[in-house]
Amino acid sequence: MVAGRKAFALQAGDALSPDKPAEAQPAQVKTDLAANRQDAVFRYAQNGVQVTKTITLHPRNFKVDVRTEVRNGPAQVNMLFPGLGKADNPRVQAVPVGGQPASVQGSGTLSVQNIQYAALQENPSQIAHALIVRPQQGTKVDVQLTGGPQGLVTATLPATSSLEVYGGKNELIHLYQSGYTELPGLFQPNFFGQISLLIVKLMEALYKVIGNWGLVIMALTILLRLVMWPLMQAQGRTTARMQLVQPLQKEIQEKYKGKTDPESQRAMQMEMAQLMRDYQVNPAGCFSTLLPFPVLIALWATIRNFEFDSGFLWLPDLATPDPFYILAVIYLFVNLGQLYVSTRKTPEMFRQQAMIYLVFLYFALTFPSGVTLYIILSTIIGIVQQIIINKQVEHETASLGQTVQKVAPGTRPASKTTVTKTIDAPKK
């Protein structure tokens, strides 16, 4: 994460010079898996100066607590934070307490006194990284920022100091879970990021009540389905009516098969339009299917980057794919069930679209298991809702009993004499 081996290295002129020998004691390491932390204490002496450095790792949120104590030495020491691994030209900035963000342009240098934080950052992405230094326990820290290909933060600390250092992804959810999104000028979430923040805050609120992340995702799925029910109901009714209309559309198309003259084509379009009006089908209703996608995209990004501290059932980590592929199999059958409910009046369409879900199976194999769990439960709820809507629409169309004029095959519409038959259809 941090370039080189000099991260957390102390300097203080001749007193702590890397060129002079030092006497180091064996490190004392203590691991607490329950608390998800590891403590290491390093002690060494150089030129009569005694240094005790305590490092506490918090792996799940990429944080490191660094506490230093320097005895028999200078009142202030420098701690180096050199670069971001292989990152090229990271952004180097700092924010003084009560001040505005200040950053280095190009390969220049800049001094900032009494910082709230200092940071090295790549442009935000899934593979970008950040290093953030934040004083703790009232420690006053001044920094010198150095720009350029690697970037460098040199922090001037008192002899006894406490720092919190973040070394992880420069990504919204990781920064939020580590408590850094409230820092001014550090990260500006986009539209999907704002949705992700709402989702993760809702997940945390549910976790306080439920206490299990798998159940939290299931509860979140139900809540989102309830919120989106008006939109999904409109889309479901459009789907149900289209199932009833499609066989009649094929009859009209068959009726005008082989007739390419403008009058016949115009007549076919008029009959199609009349059929859609009779069955109250709004072609724009299908666009409501796109509305849940921003939520799904934000949820995918949230769960993929969320650091869960427990698994669910056979799933060791909800942020990683199912290692046993059980969810992928369930995903396939559930989606085929949804496809059947949506195309039950047109079996040939079911056969055509069923192959597409074999392609979608790849996503179920690679998606975080928490996202796949959400999709499966959401789809099951959608199937139940669609069955209810189908019955409602069929009841409506059967009870209205309106006569719809249909031009018999082989005849011309409009001014020509037409043959009609009566079918059950909804009123206009």
From Swiss-Prot:
UniProt keyword annotations, A-Z: Cell membrane, Chaperone, Membrane, Protein transport, Transmembrane, Transmembrane helix, Transport
Coiled-coil ranges per UniProt: none
Subunit structure: Interacts with the Sec translocase complex via SecD. Specifically interacts with transmembrane segments of nascent integral membrane proteins during membrane integration.
GO molecular function: membrane insertase activity
A Pfam family: 60KD_IMP
GO annotation, biological process: protein insertion into membrane; protein transport
Name of the protein in its database record: Membrane protein insertase YidC
Membrane topology field: Multi-pass membrane protein
Species of the source: Deinococcus radiodurans (strain ATCC 13939 / DSM 20539 / JCM 16871 / CCUG 27074 / LMG 4051 / NBRC 15346 / NCIMB 9279 / VKM B-1422 / R1)
Primary localization class, coarse: membrane
Protein purpose: Required for the insertion and/or proper folding and/or complex formation of integral membrane proteins into the membrane. Involved in integration of membrane proteins that insert both dependently and independently of the Sec translocase complex, as well as at least some lipoproteins. Aids folding of multispanning membrane proteins.
PANTHER family in alphabetical order: CYTOCHROME C OXIDASE ASSEMBLY PROTEIN COX18, MITOCHONDRIAL (PTHR12428:SF65), OXA1 (PTHR12428)
Annotated family: Belongs to the OXA1/ALB3/YidC family. Type 1 subfamily.
Transmembrane segments: 209-229, 283-303, 323-343, 356-376
Location in the cell: Cell membrane
Keyword Membrane on entry: yes
